[in-house]
């Protein structure tokens, strides 16, 4: 269970407040205008930002004031943050130990995750020798080796072309099923949201303005679809 109770934060004079419940294994997309608070919400959950009020439960434990390292969360950003001088294997290994002192069991886990994301033949390469999609796979693998139950994605595939983006979404979909992960994914693309999540949050001015079926936004049956530039089918 991921539960936010009146989590507040002040961002550039915009007061934000989030109330949210997400069940284990649920996948939720987060959409909304630029600057509305989508990435801020993920950063609050990950512990990169400290709320000014409220309570937060992650995996049924109070993590309102815990550090990022203490939280049962992994987060993948738009920038893959791979170290150019390290091999793919070493970059992934950083998710297990910052000094890359891995046990035999950890090395086996790394190999297994690399195989899951299709990088088993690229482990000795440097990031510059990879395609954009492969670099994001490596960054995703670094998240997955941490074996945390909650995965946060902050527009990690927005810079990829449509074919690669769809490929990565399919990979995330399969990984979430296999590992029973709880997923929150920020996106500007409603089609991407529909591919990965049945439930969508629409963030507007620091609040959750819509919390419901993704399909209702796609087909315009939700009145709030107009926020995304979709003509609402609802007659007022």
Swiss-Prot record:
Q: SMART domains annotated for this entry? A: AAA (SM00382)
Pfam families per record: ABC_tran
Q: What class of enzyme is it?
A: translocase
Cellular component per GO, a single term? plasma membrane
Stated name of the protein: Thiamine import ATP-binding protein ThiQ
Q: Which GO terms describe its molecular function?
A: ABC-type thiamine transporter activity; ATP binding; ATP hydrolysis activity
Q: Which family does it belong to?
A: Belongs to the ABC transporter superfamily. Thiamine importer (TC 3.A.1.19.1) family.
Residues that bind ATP:
32-39
Which keywords, in A-to-Z order, does the entry hold? ATP-binding, Cell inner membrane, Cell membrane, Membrane, Nucleotide-binding, Translocase, Transport
Q: Establish whether keyword Repeat is in the entry.
A: no
Which reaction does this enzyme catalyse, per its entry? Answer: thiamine(out) + ATP + H2O = thiamine(in) + ADP + phosphate + H(+)
Tell me the gene name: thiQ
Q: Does the keyword Cell membrane apply?
A: yes
Tell me, in a sentence or two, what this protein's role is: Part of the ABC transporter complex ThiBPQ involved in thiamine import. Responsible for energy coupling to the transport system.
Chief place where the protein resides: membrane
């Amino acid at each position: 269970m991921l539960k936010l109770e009146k989590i507040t934060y002040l961002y550039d004079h915009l007061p934000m407040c989030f109330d949210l419940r997400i069940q284990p294994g649920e996948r939720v997309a987060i959409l909304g205008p630029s600057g509305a608070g989508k990435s801020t919400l993920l950063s609050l959950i990950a512990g990169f930002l400290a709320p000014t009020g409220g309570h937060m439960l992650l995996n049924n434990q109070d993590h309102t004031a815990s550090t990022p390292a203490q939280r049962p969360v992994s987060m993948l950003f738009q920038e893959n943050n791979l170290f150019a001088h390290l091999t793919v294997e070493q970059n992934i290994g950083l998710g297990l130990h910052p000094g890359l002192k891995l046990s035999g069991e950890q090395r086996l886990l790394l190999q297994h995750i690399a195989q899951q994301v299709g990088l088993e033949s690229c482990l000795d390469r440097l990031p510059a020798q990879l395609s954009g999609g492969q670099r994001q796979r490596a960054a995703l693998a670094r998240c997955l080796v941490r074996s945390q139950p909650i995965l946060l994605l902050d527009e990690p595939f927005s810079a990829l072309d449509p074919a690669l983006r769809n490929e990565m979404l399919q990979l995330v979909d399969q990984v979430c099923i296999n590992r029973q992960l709880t997923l929150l994914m920020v996106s500007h693309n409603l089609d991407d949201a529909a591919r990965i999540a049945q439930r969508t949050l629409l963030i507007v001015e620091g609040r959750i303005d819509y919390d419901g079926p993704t399909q209702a936004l796609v087909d315009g049956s939700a009145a709030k679809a107009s926020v995304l530039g979709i003509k609402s089918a609802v007659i007022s």
